[in-house]
A protein has these predicted regions:
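N-terminal glycine-rich anion-binding loops that anchor highly charged ligand groups
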Residues: 29-47, 75
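Short glycine-rich or small-residue beta-strand-to-loop segments that form or flank ligand, phosphate
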Residues: 9, 54, 77-88, 173-174, ...
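Short acidic, glycine/serine/threonine-rich loops at helix termini
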Residues: 19-22, 46-50, 91-97, 123-133, ...
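An acidic, phosphate/nucleotide-engaging active-site surface
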Residues: 121-176
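C-terminal non-catalytic interaction/assembly regions of soluble proteins
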Residues: 293-451
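Gly/Ser/Thr-rich loops at beta-strand to alpha-helix junctions
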Residues: 14-16, 41-43, 84-94, 177-184, ...
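N-terminal amphipathic/basic leader segments beginning at the initiator methionine
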Residues: 1-29
């Protein structure tokens, strides 16, 4: 079980993000022990967790996964993906499993596949909540029984113990549900008895592939772990890792650049040393790992809160551009006046200016002259029909509402016909919490598939 060194090849920050195939081939020549790649995150909002769908296209995912499966076969090492299908739900793991089986069938390949399911039932989470085992993190939203029961999907982020159980099956391919970005990399060196702190530290640095180098778009990096530290080497020509690019990645999605919280403990890199190694590599030693009890896993959940339809109108009239805020207020007042005492009375309308203060709003520090502006109307209702009906109700005003009673009726422009675009279900995140567990290794379910 114990090894002196472990090499892990990370092709990209996530499956679906482009990587340099020549760099990948070069990485395979280094004889890695594992190919590991992330499959998603919550970065793209709650829709994907709520719906259990992937943000990446099926064809692109299949193309890139096919390349990685080909490289795995050449290297004769396991291929591991974490947070499969963007959100890591049961349905997205099944989606990834379907792609894997299709590729294997096309290539007439025999495989042993393990799927790690990290979903939690609403009933289980509710029981843990009632027993005080669900703990809020800083800034966590308030939760209650109704919120927990109404979550369409709840997942826990697997740590190294759960990934190691999958690795121990000697599967050719491991498809994991939601996991921490680092656990899929840290698991193998820890499994082989190497430095725990260095395993977590190296995993953090390489979680996004070549983002910790001077050429982030190149994708592929190789990590080599031992008993004292780790070395990171980019596999693309003319790409370098420097002490600065490596340490800087500790700031990425991390509130404290010296502390990294993970299942079962935390990493402290306060005393870590980053040194240039050979031509384009960086050697890192000196980080510390501290176990923490009780053992906790972060949980994520999303629930359906409505349905949305949007309409967009384009305005070029200088008078209306100058008075756009007044016009928006009048538009909103007109809408709420129309829906009063109707079945649409509970519909919410949000109006956003596009092209003027669209990102920062009142905090925008730069004032510039503009010659056109778009207004996006977002209608939120408890069903799609009401959201769409509300958009149709406001249609004439979006196109022709005048600022004052005594001026000619204006005409603006819709970029589409019909202008109403059904956005579909609206989800919101429900948790920023951890769950206390007693049996880390046996907490999730493994499913075995042979092809």
């Amino acid at each position: 079980m114990n090894k002196k060194t472990v090499k892990i090849l990370v092709p990209a920050g996530a499956l679906g993000i482009p990587f340099d195939k020549n760099a990948l081939i070069n990485g395979i020549k280094q004889k890695p022990d594992l190919i590991a790649i992330d499959g998603g995150s919550t970065d793209s909002g709650p829709y994907y967790l709520g719906s259990g769908k992937s943000k990446y296209s099926y064809s692109t995912t299949k193309r890139d996964w096919s390349i990685l499966m080909e490289m795995r076969a050449k290297a004769k090492v396991p291929l591991l993906i974490g947070t499969a299908g963007t959100c890591g739900t049961k349905s997205s793991v099944e989606w990834m499993l379907k792609i894997t089986k299709e590729i294997a069938k096309e290539n007439k390949e025999k495989l042993k596949i393990v799927a790690l399911k990290t979903d939690l039932s609403n009933k289980f989470v509710l029981e843990k909540y009632k027993s005080g085992k669900i703990k809020p993190l800083e800034g966590a939203p308030k939760i209650n029984e109704d919120i927990i029961n109404n979550c369409s999907n709840i997942v826990a982020l697997a740590g190294v113990e759960q990934i190691q159980k999958a690795i121990n099956t000697k599967a050719d391919i491991i498809i994991s549900g939601r996991s921490t970005d680092t656990a899929i990399i840290a698991s193998l060196p820890i499994y082989h008895g190497l430095n725990i702190a260095s395993a977590w530290h190296g995993a953090k640095i390489a979680e996004c592939g070549a983002l910790a180098t001077n050429n982030p778009n190149s994708g592929v990096v190789l990590l080599e772990f031992d008993h004292n530290g780790f070395t990171i080497t980019p596999m693309c020509k003319n790409t370098k890792a420097t002490p600065q690019t490596v340490f800087a990645h500790m700031l990425y999605e991390n509130a404290d650049p010296y502390i990294l919280l993970e299942p079962g403990g935390y990493l402290d890199v306060s005393n870590a040393k980053y040194k240039k190694h050979k031509k384009n590599s960086v050697r890192v030693e000196g980080s510390k790992w501290y176990n923490k009890k009780p053992y906790t896993l972060k949980i994520e959940g999303a629930r359906l809160v409505g349905f949305q339809t949007i309409s967009i109108v384009l305005i070029r009239d200088p008078k209306y551009i100058e008075s756009i805020d007044k016009w928006i207020d009048k538009l909103k007042n007109s809408f709420y006046r129309k829906i009063k005492n109707s079945i649409l009375v509970d519909v919410q309308l949000e109006l956003r200016k596009i092209g003027k203060d669209a990102t920062l709003g009142n905090l925008e520090p730069i004032s510039i002259d503009i010659n056109e502006v778009a207004v996006m109307a977002i209608f939120t209702a408890n069903n799609q029909e009401k959201a769409n009906d509300s958009a149709k109700l406001l249609n004439p005003d979006l196109l022709h509402l005048a600022l004052t009673k005594n001026e000619p009726m204006p005409t603006f422009a819709f970029p589409f016909s019909p202008p109403e675009i059904d956005k579909g279900p609206l989800f919101e995140f429900c948790f920023h919490h951890v769950i206390e567990i007693d049996n880390p290794k046996d907490f999730f379910q493994l499913q075995f598939h042979k092809i």
